């Protein structure tokens, strides 16, 4: 039943990406149909409970952050590919986190932020904290603030509620394009 099938691209949904996501889905959908597979006409709205969404039996296609896939979804869904968002300094299909701070903060190295207030988007986020924790765990020994989104982490740093945050490089690019990164600087980039 095509009407019950769902598809989503929930990782990058700012207004600037809506058209690109729709075009990407149209290409995927058309390829699926050419290959004899049913596919919904349009993307489903991004749900508030992504874990339930990703486990929905009606799910045909979606994307997830790496940490939820490795930690909980790998036995429930099939990984069919990794998109290439052409992140600077990364091979095709890879990404990195950018560690940001206020531009007027005198600390200019990641080590100088130990311990400091760290904002992260979600406990199940590879880019929001896990990539940084795997690379330099000592820097995350200070207070932490879960913000609910990369955009909210950026805002927390801008407003001085947090001293630094790790932001997905693709999201950072979207936020820069939308003019939402004023007063911030990148102090570190994680390994791809």
Where do the model's predicted regions map?
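Bilobed "Venus flytrap"/periplasmic-binding protein-like clamshell domains
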Residues: 7-27, 91-154
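Local beta-strand N-terminus motif with an aromatic residue
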Residues: 57-58, 77, 110-113, 141, ...
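Alpha-to-beta junction loops
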Residues: 55-62, 116-118, 158-167
């Amino acid at each position: 039943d095509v009407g019950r099938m769902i598809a989503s691209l929930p990782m990058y949904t700012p207004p600037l990406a809506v058209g690109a996501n729709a075009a990407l889905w149209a290409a995927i959908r058309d390829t699926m149909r050419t290959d004899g597979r049913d596919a919904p006409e349009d993307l489903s709205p991004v749900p508030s409970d992504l874990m339930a969404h990703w486990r929905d039996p009606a799910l045909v296609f979606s994307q997830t952050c790496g940490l939820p896939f490795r930690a909980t979804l790998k036995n429930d869904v099939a990984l069919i590919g990794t998109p290439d968002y052409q992140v600077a300094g990364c091979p095709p299909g890879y990404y990195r986190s950018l560690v940001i701070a206020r531009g007027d903060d005198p600390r200019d190295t990641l080590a100088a932020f130990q311990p400091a207030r760290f904002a992260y988007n979600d406990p199940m986020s590879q880019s929001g904290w896990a990539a940084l924790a795997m690379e330099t765990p000592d820097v995350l020994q200070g207070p932490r603030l879960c913000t609910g989104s990369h955009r909210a982490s950026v805002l927390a740093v801008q407003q001085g509620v947090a001293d630094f945050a790790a932001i997905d490089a693709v999201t950072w690019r979207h936020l820069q394009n939308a003019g939402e990164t004023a007063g911030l600087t990148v102090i570190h980039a994680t390994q791809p």
